[in-house]
Amino acid sequence: MQWTDGKIRCHWVSPTNTTYLRYHDEEWGRPVHDDQLLFEMLILENFQAGLTWECVLNKREAFRRAFDEFDLRKVASYSEEKLTALQADSGIIRNRLKIRAAVVNAQVFQKIQQEWGSFDRYLWHWTDEKSIQEVDKVSSPLSDAISKDLKKRGMKFVGTVIIYAYLQAVGVINSHESGCFLNPLQQ
């Protein structure tokens, strides 16, 4: 479907949700190499488990406020009082297990940074620093392998489907559909 701006986009983009539209046009599938943003997207994807990405994306600013702008050091050291406050924050998804997982995942993220020099190096080494183009999948051998490794390291809510969505979000996998103006084969 061609939009009023003359562009063709992936079928899942809602023309009525400008947040979702901007996300598709400006973020999704674009390679991310900044550890701060890689951490933010990982935590947001963790909260997506069992929900729609649109639901999480619509709460993104509230998540940023609640999670101290996704400051890795702060999140990794959250106290019980902070966790209780997060569970009471109606602006975010208040799942107790996901909130606690954010702290554990922040701690593991830090350990990976220490081991690899950055989370970026760890993540992109799986593809030799290259984006992969694939569409119409929800998991792959790549997401299986990364999911398995992250679980072994202690991360939570990092099943293969969540990791695949994460890889798409941060541009390791570009899943813009054939015809979409952001599909690399269209450019």
Q: Positions of the model-derived regions?
A:
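HhH-family (HhH-GPD) DNA N-glycosylase catalytic core used in base-excision repair
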Residues: 1-187
